[in-house]
Amino acid sequence: VFCRSNGQQCTSDGQCCYGKCMTAFMGKICMR
């Protein structure tokens, strides 16, 4: 499954390689 690294924008389903999808001022990004 395609996933995003920390600091990258989450996919629409919130798929992160590690960490969680969090809402930030720049949109949703993957964070630990």
From Swiss-Prot:
Tissue expression pattern: Expressed by the venom gland.
Family named by the database record: Belongs to the neurotoxin 17 (21C2) family.
Record InterPro entries: Toxin_29 (IPR012634)
Domains: entry comment: The presence of a 'disulfide through disulfide knot' structurally defines this protein as a knottin.
Keyword presence, Disulfide bond: yes
Predominant location category: secreted
Subcellular location(s) of the protein: Secreted
Molecular-function GO term, any one: toxin activity
Keywords in alphabetical order: Disulfide bond, Knottin, Neurotoxin, Secreted, Toxin
Signal peptide: none
UniProt KW Transmembrane keyword: no
A Pfam family recorded for this sequence: Toxin_29
Function description: Acts as a neurotoxin.
Name this polypeptide is given: U13-ctenitoxin-Pn1a
Cysteine disulfide links: C3-C17, C10-C21, C16-C30
A cellular-component GO term for this protein: extracellular region
